[in-house]
Amino acid sequence: MNIYDQLQAVEDRYEELGELLSDPDVVSDTKRFMELSKEEASNRDTVIAYREYKQVLQNIVDAEEMIKESGGDADLEEMAKQELKDAKAEKEEYEEKLKILLLPKDPNDDKNIILEIRGAAGGDEAALFAGDLLTMYQKYAEAQGWRFEVMEASMNGVGGFKEVVAMVSGQSVYSKLKYESGAHRVQRVPVTESQGRVHTSTATVLVMPEVEEVEXDIDPKDLRVDIYHASGAGGQNVNKVATAVRIVHLPTNIKVEMQEERTQQKNREKAMKIIRARVADHFAQIAQDEQDAERKSTIGTGDRSERIRTYNFPQNRVTDHRIGLTLQKLDTILSGKLDEVVDALVLYDQTQKLEELNK
């Protein structure tokens, strides 16, 4: 099937979906209505671009006709030639855009995410930088109109985070933040440094798509659930009723503890969200590691310990090592304005996938 047949098939399906979504039987079936609505939304940009492309093709035909029928009118012929030139340039732009829109979509792109940030090498300074990254993602999420909820946090004594887990919900969250997984390195003078020396520290970020209960086939027998009393500062028990929950996935030994909420039920629900995401991510990583190197993730190696980005404070510089992008905008980026970085990563990924398809 060539690209035009593919595009026509997408448009035909889009029109069919429009009819189905106005069918009373479909509207009354909430689950089916949501599935079809999601499918329609995922095809919308492609259909709009394809319809605009067909109009550009018609503009080329019209301009060629005008040149033929100009009857020696130099001004009319010149105008038609300019219109033809513009339309042909537009045609090339649309063809590239449509190739990208037809690329196989990551099935997780529309999902919410579980975001984990940990202070790694560098002690207190690494934990403080983990807090800076948390703020950066919070502000970026706010600008995107997403919901950002801190689910669990383990702080150190200086206001940094040894570990923090957050849920980010909204439209196409995973598609934009999936490239953030990896080691983020910071170079700056710590507050505690009296000699003014630049120190290097690292925080790690892990982005996992949310896994709905219906998607995850976790056998309850594979889970050990412990209930205990939530503890506050200094280790004292803060609840008379045991509300804290620890869930261990026995086959992988993945463990989640949750005590942020006041009820055992809510802590259990949150812990299960994280455990489903971590277990799915664990097996996804095994599957990816077994793939041929050529078929691995097109950005980086997929290695969680891979250094993906450096934040250099003295030079106000951010460098993404995977795509060779350097921006002298560290302050802007840490304030949540991540669009330039995200857009560059998305474009690079799409370009790599196009090259693979053309091999």
From Swiss-Prot:
It is found in: Cytoplasm. GO terms for cellular component: cytoplasm. Gene3D superfamilies: 3.30.160.20, 3.30.70.1660, 6.10.140.1950. Keywords: Cytoplasm, Methylation, Protein biosynthesis. Methylated by PrmC. Methylation increases the termination efficiency of RF1. GO terms for molecular function: translation release factor activity, codon specific. The modification N5-methylglutamine is found at residue 236. PANTHER family: LD18447P. Belongs to the prokaryotic/mitochondrial release factor family. Peptide chain release factor 1 directs the termination of translation in response to the peptide chain termination codons UAG and UAA. This is Peptide chain release factor 1. It comes from Streptococcus pneumoniae serotype 19F (strain G54). The gene is prfA.
